[in-house]
Amino acid sequence: MVDPLKIFWVLTNSTYLVTKFVRIGIADKNDSPPYFDRFLYETEIDENADLQSTVLTVNAKDHNESTNIRYQITGGNIGNAFAVQNTTGVIYVASPLDYETRPRYELRLEATRNRKNNYTTVVINVRDVNDNPPVFDRQTYRTQITEEDDRNLPKRILQVTATDGDVDRPINIVYFLTGQGIDPDNPANSKFDINRTTGDIFVLKPLDRDQPNGRPQWRFTVFAQDEGGEGLVGYADIQVNLKDINDNAPQFPQGIYFGNVTENGTAGSSVMTMSAVDYDDPNESTNAKLIYSIEKNVIEEETGAPIFEIEPETGLIKTAVCCLDRERTPDYSIQVVAMDGGGLKGTGTASIRVKDLNDMPPQFTKDEWVTEVDETNGTYIPETPILTVTVQDEDETNTFQYKVVPNSGFGADKFAMVRNGDGTGSLKIIQPLDYEDPLQSSGFRFRIQVNDKGDDGPGGSDKYHVAYSWVVVKLRDINDNVPKFDREHIEVSIYEDTKVGTILEQFKATDADQGGHSKVAYKIVRSTNRKRQFAISDRGAVSIQRPLDRETQDRHHIQILAIDDGSPARTATATLTVIVKDVNDNAPTFAQDYKPTLPENVSGKKILEVAAKDPDDRLRGNGGPFTFRLDPLASDEIKAGFKVEYDRRGDNENGVAIISSLRPFDREAQKSYAIPIEIKDNGAPAMTGTSTLTVTIGDVNDNKMQPGSKSVLVYNYQGQSQDTPIGRVYVNDPDDWDVPDKKYYWEVQEHQRFKLDTDTGILTMRAGTRRGRYQLRFKVYDREHGQEDIPANLSVTVRDITAEAVQQAGSMRLSHITDEDFVRTWNPVKNQVEPSKLERFRNKLAELLYTDRDNVDVFSVQLKEGSPYPLTDVHFAARSATQQPYFKAVRLNGVVQMHREEIEKDVGLNITMVNINECLHEGKGKCGSNSCTSKVELGKKPYTVSVNRTALVGVRLDISAQCVCRARNFTHQDHNCRTHLCYNGGRCVETRNGPKCVACPVGYNGPRCQQSTRSFRGNGWAWYPPLQLCQESHLSLEFITRVADGLILYNGPIVPPKPEETVISDFIALELEQGYPRLLIDFGSGTLELRVKTKKTLDDGVWHRLDIFWDTENVRMVVDFCRTALVSEMEDGTPPEFDDNACQARGQIPPFAESLNLNQPLQLGGLYRQHFDQTLYNWQYAFSSKGFDGCIRNVIHNSEHYDLAFPALARNSFPACPQTDEVCLKTEHTARCWEHGNCVASLVQAKCHCQPGWMGPGCNVPTIPTTFKAQSYVKFALSFEPDRFSTQLQLRFRTREQGGELFRVSDQHHREYAILELRRGHLQFRYNLNSMRNEEQLLTLTAIAVNDGQWHVIRISRYGSAALMELDGGESRRYNESFHFTGHQWLTIDKQEGVYAGGKAEYTGIKTFEVQSDFQRSCLDDIRLDGKHLPLPPAMNGTQWGQATMARNLERNCPSNRPCSNVICPDPFDCVDLWNEYECTCSEGRIMSSDTKGCVDRNECLDLPCLNGATCINLEPRLRYRCICPEGYWGENCELVQEGQRLKLSMGALGAIFVCLIIILILALIFVLYSRKRKTTKKKKRSGPEKDVRETVISYEDEGGGEDDMTAFDITPLQIPISAQGGPPDIAACKMPIIYPVMTLLPPGQELNVAYLMEERKQRIDKDNNAPPFDDLRNFTFEGSGSIAESLSSLASGTDDENQDFNYLQNWGPRFNALAAMYVHDKAKASSQLPSDGGGGSGDGPGPGASSSSPLGGGGTGGGSGIPGNVLAVVATGSGAGPGGGGGSSGLMPLPEVDKVVL
């Protein structure tokens, strides 16, 4: 039992409880004292022993063996060094021990029990340990030696001594040094050393005290370590001072010193101070005391006296003579000597420059200056100087002041002189100049003056310092006067039937310029003449051009422009007001849209009164009163059923018609009647018109209902539809207005996916209803007839329709048919059900597309609103097979157009428009002749078409015309990755400036990964989407060919027009004819032909570019940017000449059509259309149908690049340009530039065009960007001659600044320039090509900001006065252009002074400059001028094309300023470095939650990245997403498809193939004969399994079965070839050329059903004929393969299989049932899962059974069972018999169709 008090004592360390504890009990009395075994105990302990360390345990004993003995030390414990535990006798260390203080202790130890005690002696000897480090006698040792003393080395300089406090230990101290002059790694370099035992220190080398290599003092440390270098360490400092000797001569560090002295100064003038340096000790005698003297002075020629003197002590140089003359001697050089106290000398040179005083007069470099200047434009005074004058002055320091001498000549008051920073003077205009003033037209002559005193004060009056010169200013006439009309406002009144061509008025304007001889042209402002009803002649006569209509517009305000022939032209405006008077030219009509209803079964009664209206002017008697009557031509049925009575007094005496019925009507016979009513007005002559009144017969519930059934087809858009009404439950009842009399019920119970309105019978499909077929049953009650429980059945079929199907849908508009008629299946005439027009159209379309009808979806049928007669819009989609991408809309529309007549005939339709386009009919829409885009928007709710027996619930599509040019509309908000399609597998990423396509595959180099090039062979074509309608359009393309004739492009009708339809004859055709470009274009009012007779034909095997421009009136075609134009420019200000006949053609569209309306496929390279007479469309010119042979690239319409990779339909057309690719492969560097560049080739040569950021012949050298800091710039000197007509600039940049100049080129005086700059965060390019006046042109990318910190690539292309801007590929908002050749065309570039990057430096002083438009805190990279790389310091200062002659404040690379370094973002956001800016946002792959407080996974599948019908699966943020591709597609986004290219084989190749086929047939015959012989041999040998161990069936159950020799196994069956070309080696020579896959792409896809997709993929693998194993007999499982058993013989008796659980194989699906049957021990369970219709089999071997349920058919290896035990044999092809011989049939498919079996 543990005593708790003892525990407490231990825990509290309390001796009180222990000493006071008294054990109470009864015991024997013991009064004997305790005793010790010995009288003396002796032990040892180290002096460094730890406190509490046990020294010795001494135990006393008691005669009664008592343990109650207490111990204490009573003597000898000096310093309480030890203590004893009073109960145990353990002596321990209580205080630190020190051997050197007390080496021995003799303790007296007392033991006490019951007040009886005894004593003993304990002797403790303290052992010495090394606990004292050596101690030096001094802390610092100092000594002095003389520098450079090399005598008696090494020399002892002092001795150090250290002692060890451990007195009784061996004295064995070792010394060593560290510090200055000590090199432990290489002792040979040390300056000092020490004797390790004596402490003597030696100097080893002579020491130098003096600078620059010496030192006056050496300090190092000496260490002493006892125990022979193994013990403790002590240290001391050593200081060695060096005594100086005079061993250094004085010297002048700079060698040459520069000073100044003013000319004409007095003698003794201070010039400069020369200071020499002596490194000797200045405190050591006179070693460093210097005395200066002039050793070589200059002598004054006249007197022979020295010119300069020097003060010996200070070195101050003074003039010794007076009056130095700078103009005589501008500088002097003297030699000065400095000598120290020891006589050592040093020499320096003083270069003295005489500073100038203004003591010489100025002089103009010309006596007369002549210049020519434009007259000023009104009161505007230009700031630019018109003349720069220069002055010569022998003085160096001058401050020139210029001025015009007042009253010195005519014009002196109109000009002023100003001083320039470089000392020249400029003449500026200060008052308006007017050429039209006869006095001024002859020019001006006056004097100017200059003085070099800098002011007009007293110095200016000093005639000695003033010079004069004459100035002659010639004045040029400019177009500064606007034309002036004689009459600015004219008003005329005419009747609306005035004949076309009638002249209304004559305008006349004059212009004061050119002496009144300026020509004036006249023009009507188009916005005031929208319908082009008026025209104006060259002489100003305004006439009627098109008929007028007062009812449309009764007053016209026509603005007339008078335009002079100046440059730039000036205009004046006048107004013609045309008042149109009325004539009676309109027939009256109904006053309103009457819709009367007449109940059925009612006798004759009044229906309603009808009034009339007339748009003609009633005040002129051209309106009412009206008269009415029934149209005499009305049918007899109408005449018998209705009457029309005229009431003169009705409608306020205007007259009305009273309509009445004459008999009762039956609605079930006819639902409505159209009554024609003739209305006549009161005009002279009167106008008569016929209006039709539709009377609807109202329904009465007078028929009993019969059971009915109805089928409903629902298209569920992306499976996301909400609750959707799908129509009314149908019963067969002729009445159709009797819904209030009926009640509708479910027959049994309500279906969970549908909801019924019992009052209306409307059935609603609930949200989330999946695709499939639903059979629904209802009952209907009719209270009117008392009918109950009339059955009504409803079949609902739900189909999913994808976004891809809607996007790629074709469309057509049907006339005179309603949406109900299109889907109706009941024929009331034949009184029977028949296929609807929808189904017939669907079948016909499937036939035309060569696809199954199930692959055609007619998913939207809508009745167009607002039409006077029924118009129905139909949208449809189709594909070649399930899981395949949908056909493109262009293909669907084209096929329907091509077969329109056939479809109309077979289906019974009237197709009025294919590819529904609300912009197609010019002038009928809201946009008029403006830009127009037909936009299709997805409605929020489905569109339901419900008729009695059928209903279609389709996708609602709202089509509207928007008056914008789609490509140039930058205001829409839905600019994101969902609308910004990236082609060909490119990946769309969202940026702050909108979506951007990245990771484009190689060869797809368009801005959105478009394929830019396509080739044609002369007999092909390719279809693409039609050209969009824009008010101003620009179409450009490039082509290359060696064939002189061929159709390059055509967009227009592809079928002849129908006789009764409105003909839309618009088309555009571009072709080569005899090597020259020819354009035909027709807006519908006449064909315009443009031809360009180029200097050389364009079939020269070189790429050529054609640009076609058109607006509402004008068309222009430009060839190769007009680089071949003849340009003539003079320096005297003569207007330039520009002859563009060989590069440009212009024309006007015949009136009056104003827009190119197209909705047919755009065809490139040829023509695919029906042959028809082109005169059917009234075309005045015919174009060739011969195909183009060559390549076409970069087809761009209004800055949108066409993707040429996958046309909707094509023939004999291929992506890329194989003809030029062959040229690229001919040279090594062009064949290897694909990784970071593009090979650009013609048919004769190729070169590498490097991607931005790369350079070098093979585009394999990365460029290095440069950071431009504040006040930074680079000035270049070019080593090539820039083209004056063309300028190409490309560079990369990144910035966050609002402004700055990126690059500029200019002439010497910066009057002609081209500047790329940043303004308010947007790029702009401005240029001026006229050195005489400012005619600046400006291009800006206003729709996109570029100061987002991202890298951008800008490309500027200037051709003459035309310019193009392309940012990051240049599409849509990243493109702008000015494509007009007007005025000057040349830009002169100064190669040395005119090329800058980062801003232009203006020097404000000798060493100070200021950078204008400083491009700072930004980066530039890869600057190319005319395609040539310019260097960017500091990484590169020069290339073969130029040098960076000046550069300031630049930094290599483009690092960020680490904005996240001091930012802590709140969880869960991360700080993202956006380059010089940061953002706390979510990590990659995540987006901010709706409450902006957290991050959630970004669903990349919403961007529809998976193409071609692939399924998108959203993954974790790091992995983003994954696409499951349909059959035949691959790639990250399923964008690629393998398409075998057709090979053209020569006769030699065909012969080789024929020979190979013969050899193969012979070998096949030999193989057959050999096989038959071998089979016969096998049958003879097979007498039992014991005969040959190579038999595959053995009696494994026998004792020792399977233990025979198995090494004779025939290995031949195991030699399975991996390709189909197995056989003898000779066959390899007959292999066909390899057909490499071609990457192609089909249209974007949408999500698929994953389960269905996996099933389809498995079926495809089963049917793949091209993948191994191939048709042959193979051993798929052989003995011992993949098993832990060594042979099949061990399977029956072994136990290893018992430990293996293969039951999981049963869960792998039916395709793995055979594998499960092999390994699962429960054979019955496995067999029960196999198909049940497999055939049985029989064989020669003793198989375990005859029946088989294997999907492989009956027959096993040697047995009748399909799967005998654990043995498997597979027959891949043939009759289904296994190797054992048993016959069988497949449970899955007929065996002859099986290509292979996959387990």
From Swiss-Prot:
InterPro entries in UniProt: Cadherin, Cadherin-like_dom, Cadherin-like_sf, Cadherin_CS, Cadherin_Y-type_LIR, Catenin-bd_sf, ConA-like_dom_sf, EGF-like_Ca-bd_dom
Single GO term (MF): cadherin binding
Keyword Transit peptide found: no
Carbohydrate attachment residues: 13, 64, 86, 118, 195, 260, 264, 283, 377, 601, 793, 910, 948, 969, 1376, 1437
Compartments, record wording: Cell membrane
Membrane topology, record value: Single-pass type I membrane protein
Gene Ontology BP annotations: axon extension involved in axon guidance; calcium-dependent cell-cell adhesion via plasma membrane cell adhesion molecules; cell migration; cell-cell adhesion mediated by cadherin; cell-cell adhesion via plasma-membrane adhesion molecules; homophilic cell adhesion via plasma membrane adhesion molecules; neuron projection development; ommatidial rotation
Biased composition range(s): Gly residues: 1733-1744, 1752-1763, 1775-1786
Notes concerning its domains: Three calcium ions are usually bound at the interface of each cadherin domain and rigidify the connections, imparting a strong curvature to the full-length ectodomain.
Free-text function comment from the UniProt entry: Cadherins are calcium-dependent cell adhesion proteins. They preferentially interact with themselves in a homophilic manner in connecting cells.
Annotated protein name in UniProt: Putative neural-cadherin 2
Underlying gene: CadN2
